[in-house]
Amino acid sequence: MLLALRRKAIHGIRFSSGKCGQNLSGSTIGPKFTSDKEVEEFLSKSTWDVREYVPSSVDEKLIPSEETVVRLLKISGLPIKNIDQIQIRLANQLSFINRLHNLPVDENINPNHARIIERNPTPLDYEGLIKGIASQQKSDSLGEISGSWDPTKTAAVKRDGFFILREGLLKGRD
């Protein structure tokens, strides 16, 4: 079931070696998932139901004219058929958007934090970064194998993992 969810909607969860965790290619948002059960619990939490905001009847004022729908279909390159159904669907979508716009908004919340993260994230500091680096583990599944990359591998002159520059290359530099 989880793999099907991953293919359809979840792009930030990585499954490897029986464990699941957030994709670490960017910044981490929230705690890591340690089991499939935690992922299922997270996804099963319902904060609100879309059906509460979907209209049960169509508001006649929101139904776009036939000319407008035909023009939108032409611009979109879509076939011009089933215009009555499209008008009703567009009216429902407009009604849904209007209801979302009319919801009360907490003005004290920073809109930059309007994601699935804590509302007041702690700022990064040097000690926290050093601890994070010290506890960071390499992932074989991402190709992070210790000693697998040698930056001086193709250098003509090198010693103990360092590049050696000849004196002639340094002339004329201040």
Curated annotation (Swiss-Prot):
GO biological process, one term: glutaminyl-tRNAGln biosynthesis via transamidation
GO molecular function annotations of the record: ATP binding; glutaminyl-tRNA synthase (glutamine-hydrolyzing) activity
InterPro entries: GatF
Keyword ATP-binding in record: yes
GO CC terms of this entry: glutamyl-tRNA(Gln) amidotransferase complex; mitochondrial inner membrane
Reaction equations catalysed: L-glutamyl-tRNA(Gln) + L-glutamine + ATP + H2O = L-glutaminyl-tRNA(Gln) + L-glutamate + ADP + phosphate + H(+)
Keyword Membrane: yes
Keyword annotations of the record: ATP-binding, Ligase, Membrane, Mitochondrion, Mitochondrion inner membrane, Nucleotide-binding, Protein biosynthesis
E.C. number: 6.3.5.-
Membrane-topology annotation of the record: Peripheral membrane protein
Localization annotation: Mitochondrion inner membrane
Catalytic class of the enzyme: ligase
Subunit details: Subunit of the heterotrimeric GatFAB amidotransferase (AdT) complex, composed of A, B and F subunits.
Miscellaneous field: This protein may be expected to contain an N-terminal transit peptide but none has been predicted.
Family from the record: Belongs to the GatF family.
Functional summary from the UniProt entry: Allows the formation of correctly charged Gln-tRNA(Gln) through the transamidation of misacylated Glu-tRNA(Gln) in the mitochondria. The reaction takes place in the presence of glutamine and ATP through an activated gamma-phospho-Glu-tRNA(Gln). Required for proper protein synthesis within the mitochondrion.
Listed name of the protein: Glutamyl-tRNA(Gln) amidotransferase subunit F, mitochondrial
Protein source organism: Kluyveromyces lactis (strain ATCC 8585 / CBS 2359 / DSM 70799 / NBRC 1267 / NRRL Y-1140 / WM37)
